[in-house]
């Protein structure tokens, strides 16, 4: 059975006294998380929840006032943060290059951290049926606080109603406050009867991600689709200009502006990625294999993107490529389709007609690939999508680790 995971963000409406209780809880939880984080940092990064619970549980109960389940959740929250950091360090090794020597790579571990992980935002993790539960026929939320349980109403927009039909399993939620409003973020899982099978693939779609075109796709029918990124980047430049102006002032009001702009930009970027991925999944439907480049470990340092302008380098580093792949994955799973990631080696350098691989054949200044062997010429992003799609066909044929190999001509 295939499983899909989504996060529902419930807008809750606590009363004035309840807001004080939630504020006290989330602030205490934040301070407690920073205490646990410092302990882990100072003691060689132990990440076993059972052992940490034996050492820190009583302190969290007595000195920070957390209830039993919240104390356990606090430890797990911090462990999860360090495991995420550990994965990030592993996927982005330190690199250096001495004169006339090949570039060297060193795997980074948690020992590379210079200071403990910081929890800067008041929030708390709520376990289903312990810290939060739906009561009164599912119309009211019962929430745990340091002062006892409270009952709050919540909004159920039309797009959320299907999540309450009994087919979704709710997990550990996160209570947060944003601009004076309160939200409970609940991850949900659901099993689907239909599951992707390589034996019933109808479409193989290669997707090249970038900035000039946020996504360029190429399918088994030879159809190419470009998702223009020019207007998107122009709007991001407007956000950046507002941020730069606010940062130059450095006042408290400027910091509030920065916070609002950041939230607005993040929501807008999420919507852009949502619309792109929804378009792709709707267009191709069930039984589609979407193929992406695995950008894990790809370095956006000055050396690798030196051909870009300063603005281009900033845009490349900050665009949410990872979020797009996440959204595409869960949307694909809903339609019994699949997303795979392939090695990006040579995808932008290979001629899809004769197989010639040559870096110089890609001309960034005119955004074209011109093969010096057979003369084939096309948009450089399209070339990338074509090669990515080819690797997808190898995967369908049984090659679980498809990659392009350098072909001498």
Model-inferred region functions:
Residues 1-409:
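Nucleic-acid substrate recognition interfaces
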């Amino acid at each position: 059975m295939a499983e899909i995971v989504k996060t529902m963000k419930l807008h809750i409406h606590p009363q004035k006294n309840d807001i004080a209780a939630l504020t006290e809880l989330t602030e205490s939880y934040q301070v407690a998380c920073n205490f646990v984080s410092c302990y882990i940092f100072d003691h060689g990064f132990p990440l076993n929840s059972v052992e940490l619970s034996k050492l820190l549980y009583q302190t969290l109960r007595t000195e920070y006032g957390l209830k039993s389940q919240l104390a356990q959740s606090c430890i797990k929250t911090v462990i999860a943060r360090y495991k995420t950091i550990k994965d990030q360090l592993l996927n982005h090794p330190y690199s250096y290059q001495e004169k006339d020597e090949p570039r060297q790579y060193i795997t980074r571990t948690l020992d590379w951290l210079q200071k403990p992980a910081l929890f800067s935002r008041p929030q708390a993790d709520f376990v289903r049926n312990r810290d939060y539960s739906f009561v009164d026929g599912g119309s009211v939320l019962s929430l745990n606080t340091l002062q006892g349980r409270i009952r709050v109403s919540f909004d159920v927009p039309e797009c959320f109603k299907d999540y309450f039909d009994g087919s979704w399993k709710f997990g550990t939620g996160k209570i947060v406050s944003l601009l004076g409003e309160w939200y409970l973020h609940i991850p949900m899982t659901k099993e689907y009867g239909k599951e992707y099978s390589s034996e019933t693939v109808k479409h193989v779609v290669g997707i090249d991600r970038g900035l000039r075109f946020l996504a360029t796709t190429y399918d088994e029918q030879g159809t190419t689709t470009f998702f223009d990124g020019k207007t998107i980047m122009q709007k991001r430049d407007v956000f950046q200009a507002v941020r730069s102006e606010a940062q130059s002032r450095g006042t408290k009001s400027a910091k509030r502006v920065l916070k609002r702009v950041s939230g607005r930009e993040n929501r807008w970027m999420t919507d852009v990625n949502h619309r792109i991925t929804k378009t792709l999944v709707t267009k191709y439907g069930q039984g589609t294999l979407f193929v992406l480049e695995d950008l894990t470990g790809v370095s956006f340092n000055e050396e690798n993107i030196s051909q870009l302008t300063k603005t281009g380098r900033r845009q490349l580093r900050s665009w949410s490529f990872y979020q797009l792949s996440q959204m595409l994955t869960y949307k694909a799973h809903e339609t019994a389709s699949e997303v795979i990631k392939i090695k990006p080696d040579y995808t932008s350098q290979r001629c899809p007609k004769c197989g010639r691989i040559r870096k110089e054949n890609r001309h960034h200044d005119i955004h074209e690939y011109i093969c010096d062997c057979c003369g084939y010429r096309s948009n450089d992003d399209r070339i990338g999508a074509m090669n990515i799609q080819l690797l997808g066909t190898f995967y369908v044929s049984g090659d679980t680790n498809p990659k392009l190999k350098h072909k001498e001509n």
